[in-house]
């Protein structure tokens, strides 16, 4: 397809359905903005009748929903998958970004940080202040898990609390202030076999004297057929994105930790009833979150239970649970199911190169960030199976940058 000129691209019909406080909507718009295209934004929360219009056009009950011309792209994950596969630019009718030519030398940096979030951005701040001129491969889903967090109340320095996206924007600006270069693309390959270490994105290669892995973690799913079949049709892992779509309805949250309780409390703003389904008879979340949820009149707990099936044909109409002690089953009438059963580390890229523990977390020298490979450091949720907090992630990001700086000095790298 020949590339369109700027005016043709500007006039191309791109529609994105969004709502307020939707992190994936913000990420989708940022990706489209990076392509130099304009779009029409339809806020289904503030514009009457637009929710039903979106559902009719897309068959989905999640935001964002993106249409490019006559093509229904889907949500942010679909948009970013097209970008990673090199399919987005042709659909937009624009020339692709710079493509590495055969034999062309990779771009070299003293420090490359793979991943963003509080760990990656903190590592970048410290590395940049040490004049190491770091490159951050932030990923298309930049900012880590905090981008999906409504309120952060336990990070020092924010007495009134702060939203996750707001906090990550501040981290990013601080990193850039000191000279960090940020690329919002996914790393497709990492080579730790020899120095300089290699990192690839879709169409470019980079090398680094020191590598910091801050790849974070991703939400776990139940792994049942009905969950996958009804994904984005009432099944979600992002209450801030999709909760308001089910205003006045009953909903369910699966899980018993802080994330599940936070989701339940947020959903209670919109729902008539929120069922929290937990496989144990006690919660794992912090005391203050437990108290808030247990005392909330709209939240009902379904103890000692697991989800056997998400019920529904076209959209979610219920959830079938089973008590793990009595084997008794019941069906709860809900129109949305939010999964909050924990996370797993994003370590697939380096699985056969770096030592991992049995759960897939990167192992490091005790008290440090050094992996089993000299010059490769790890921080954040990718190496922390215990705490998994924003403040501890930031702390390990600091450690990784300092460890990398000292190691480079020992190697005589300038």
Task: Show where each model-derived region lies.
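Beta1-alpha1 glycine-rich phosphate/pyrophosphate-binding loop at the start
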Residues: 19-20, 33, 109-178, 249, ...
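Thioredoxin-like thiol-disulfide oxidoreductase module
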Residues: 43-61, 87-95
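Structural micro-motif
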Residues: 58-68, 76-77
